[in-house]
Design a protein with these regions (language model features):
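C-terminal membrane-cytosol helix-exit motif in multi-pass small-molecule transporters
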Residues: 125-148, 331-339
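Cytoplasmic helix-loop-helix junction between adjacent transmembrane helices
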Residues: 58-94
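Extracytoplasmic gate region of multi-pass secondary transporters
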Residues: 160-210
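C-terminal transmembrane helical hairpin of 12-TM major facilitator-type secondary transporters
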Residues: 225-270
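Helix-loop-helix hairpin linking two adjacent transmembrane segments in secondary transporters
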Residues: 83-84, 88-139
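Helix-to-loop junctions at the C-terminal end of transmembrane segments
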Residues: 15-27, 211-224, 309
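Conserved MFS/SLC helix-loop-helix module at the cytosolic interface between two early adjacent transmembrane helices
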Residues: 13-50
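Intracellular juxtamembrane helix-capping segments at the cytosolic ends
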Residues: 68-81, 265-279
Length: 344
């Protein structure tokens, strides 16, 4: 299972460098169709894979599918809701939260009916193909003509400013914050004497869903996205510090909700929206760049956490909290830099 998950990440890293530019050059529809076809192949391939090697190959295809849909969905939402692109992008995260909430119930229904585990994959494959038909026939928002875009590109030169690089790197730090917590909170809770750490996950999911709705409302009322990218990591840092110093089971429950809210509640999506401001005609590329940073975080930070777990013994969970705090603080500094230099 771990190898298949790793293959999904590999597929993303392989395809993200060109999925965004392809989306910008040939349109969001094509990127979406490629993503749908790859996802359908992934679901059916995993369901009927005769060996681990075949499953691994289809998992790479699944990672490719994910990157192409990323560079279709996020830019399209921002282009449909031009007055509230960040709010639109936040609701892509809300859709993910909703599916994560429903999936365990669907698995339970399949299990209670004594159906094969393949049922979930087959149903998902059919559902994504239906989505593909909708992508194929429904209208997409109009974009600038290629000639005008080319002229704009020549005029601006599309130079990547230091502020743009900082915005991209927030994809790394914001992903690290919630991934470290998500993968390491169970061990921390057990070390603090919690009998049932699984409760943390429920509060984490609740915090994430709450954050998306609340943040969307705050932004509509005038809160700037860049201020969210400063405030939410600051809240996460304070919460991580409390989890470090207060060695009691209840703090893990509080931390689950707060990190779900401030760490996973759309910060990555707002990083995409902020980066897209530096690439107004290349939102697909902007999405790719942030997601590449996120994918690198997924591999490097979790590998480092695994090493700490291996050598740290009983102190490892709290050492990982320190790592998480350090990375999250770097994210705050990056956001402050973007705020100060975004118009230069």
């Amino acid at each position: 299972v771990v190898s298949v998950i790793a293959a999904l990440g590999l597929g993303r890293l392989i395809s993200l460098p060109f999925s965004g530019p392809l989306s910008d050059k040939f349109g969001r529809r094509l990127s979406g169709i490629i993503g749908v076809i790859c996802y359908a192949a992934y679901f059916m391939g995993i369901a009927f894979a005769p060996s681990m090697g075949v499953a691994y190959a289809f998992a790479i295809v699944g990672g490719i599918a994910n990157s192409f849909l990323d560079t279709c969905v996020s830019p399209t939402c921002m282009e449909i809701y031009v007055n509230n692109p960040s709010v639109a992008n936040l609701f892509t995260k809300f859709s993910i939260c909703l599916s994560q909430f429903l999936l365990p119930f669907l698995i339970g229904i399949v299990a209670s009916a004594n159906m094969s585990y393949k049922t979930i994959f087959i149903v998902a494959g059919i559902a994504i193909l239906i989505d593909g038909i909708l992508i194929l026939i429904l209208p997409f928002p109009a974009r600038k003509k290629a000639v005008q875009a080319k002229a704009d590109k020549k005029k601006s030169g599309h130079k990547i400013s230091p502020a743009a690089i900082a915005a991209i790197l927030i994809g790394f730090t914001s992903s690290s914050t919630f991934m470290l917590w998500l993968n390491c909170n169970q061990e921390l809770a057990r070390s603090y004497g919690m009998a049932d750490p699984s409760k943390i996950q429920s509060l984490y999911a609740l915090g994430t869903a709450t954050a998306i709705l609340a943040t969307a409302a705050f932004i509509k009322k005038g809160l700037k996205e860049i201020n969210v990218l400063i405030l939410y990591p600051l809240i996460s840092t304070i919460m991580l510090a409390l989890c470090y110093f207060i060695q009691a089971p209840f703090i893990c429950l509080v931390g689950g909700f707060v990190i779900g809210y401030a760490g996973a509640g759309g910060v990555l999506q707002l990083a995409v929206s902020t980066t897209a401001e530096f690439f107004p005609e290349n939102k697909g590329t902007a999405t790719s760049l942030v997601m590449i940073a996120s994918s690198i975080a997924n591999y490097t930070i979790l590998s480092l956490a695994g090493y700490i777990t291996k050598v740290g013994g009983s102190s490892a969970p709290r050492m990982i909290l320190l790592l998480n705090m350090a990375v999250t603080i770097i994210g705050i500094l990056l956001a402050l830099f973007v705020k100060k230099n975004r118009n230069k």
